[in-house]
Amino acid sequence: MALKKRSKHSKKFKLNLGPQHPATHGVLRLILEMDGEIVERADPHIGLLHRGTEKLIEYKTYLQAIPYFDRLDYVSPMCQEHAFALAIEHLLKCEVPLRAQYIRVMFSELTRILNHTLNIATQALDVGATTPLLWMFEEREKIMEFYERVSGSRLHANYFRPGGVAQDLPEGLIENIVDFCEQFPCKIADLETLLTDNRIWKQRTVDIGIVSKQQAMDWGFSGVMLRGSGIAWDLRKSQPYDQYANLDFDVAIGKNGDCYDRYLIRIEEMYQSIKIIKQCIQKMPVGEIKTQDPSISPPKRSEIKKSMEALINHFKLYSEGYNVPAGEVYAAVEAPKGEFGVYLYSDGTNRPYRCRIKAPGFAHLQGLDFMARGHSLSDIITIIATLDIVFGEIDR
């Protein structure tokens, strides 16, 4: 509950929180105007991780720009690659093979689990519970191993491509993902046993950081922050992309718009992600994993060894890239943190003229001020954790 009772002798002062504080989940500097232990105003200072990503992309070919998206929200990298790939595909008007679409959806949902396990585990750690962190990192390790087997990297995957994915699934990976899907719901249940009905956890999260429906709309919230306030908006349902329209899953929404509701939604989303992954595995056909258009997709290694034309095409695609037709497009995906969007403007050359990135955490951090007012200093840590912010995407 927000603390409103004030002492006659309370003294107002300013408190600097961060940017080196572990509970700020990155390089966040907060200037808090305090009245004793009560927060009257919270002023976030951002930009400490600014690297000029949008400008750097303008100097790269479309293929060379993909790794920059892994380094935005580095907790859920593949979802951001997905948005950039969709934007390029809209301009190219290229068809993505069915198998590639299911692989993309499957890894997007694995990424969602990767994100939510970290968020819940670190939020629990911030309020004093160590066990969830140890348990969930064990599960995250398995997903990172799937990342490594499919892309060669545990974190910055660089796996999605305009027109499909970089390479097919290695032998035995599907079976391992099936095994993971069978045992992971039990791990979520164990996590719920620790937290959901825990008296201390509820005291730290119930009625903390309340966001009303109107506030969520006014501040441009998306994802869990929006659904926690009772608004059933999920891009996978409302504006389906790839194969989401053919998959059966539910959208979890909250009632009270507090930290506890948002925790429950993240738990339910992990259950739904497992459901989606299982359907992807069942429906995934045998076939190509990227478009066969030679002007976009490099030839196979076997073709390069036989054909000089294939070798030349391969060299040109990796050295010069391909020209994307002039035009502009906005493509968005339902990333774990909210709506991640890419506005792409092409002038018909092999490099983007402008690439504007919409990061969900940017809007959510703006709302920290009204969410924090009237709460104690210790509640600020819980509110920052429930925002699920990563400064790679906020500062860009």
Swiss-Prot record:
InterPro entries in the cross-refs: NADH_Q_OxRdtase_suD, NADH_UbQ_OxRdtase_49kDa_CS, NDH1_su_D/H, NiFe-Hase_large
Keyword list, A-Z: Cell inner membrane, Cell membrane, Membrane, NAD, Quinone, Translocase, Transport, Ubiquinone
Main location: membrane
Pfam families attached to this UniProt entry: Complex1_49kDa
Protein name (Swiss-Prot/TrEMBL): NADH-quinone oxidoreductase subunit D
Keyword Cell inner membrane: yes
The enzyme's E.C. designation: 7.1.1.-
Organism: Orientia tsutsugamushi (strain Boryong)
Subunit structure: NDH-1 is composed of 14 different subunits. Subunits NuoB, C, D, E, F, and G constitute the peripheral sector of the complex.
Cited function: NDH-1 shuttles electrons from NADH, via FMN and iron-sulfur (Fe-S) centers, to quinones in the respiratory chain. The immediate electron acceptor for the enzyme in this species is believed to be ubiquinone. Couples the redox reaction to proton translocation (for every two electrons transferred, four hydrogen ions are translocated across the cytoplasmic membrane), and thus conserves the redox energy in a proton gradient.
Subcellular location: Cell inner membrane
Domain of life: Bacteria
One cellular component (GO) term of this entry: plasma membrane
Stretches that traverse the bilayer: none
Catalyzed reaction equations: a quinone + NADH + 5 H(+)(in) = a quinol + NAD(+) + 4 H(+)(out)
Membrane topology designation: Peripheral membrane protein
Enzyme class: translocase
Species classification: Bacteria, Pseudomonadati, Pseudomonadota, Alphaproteobacteria, Rickettsiales
Membership in a protein family: Belongs to the complex I 49 kDa subunit family.
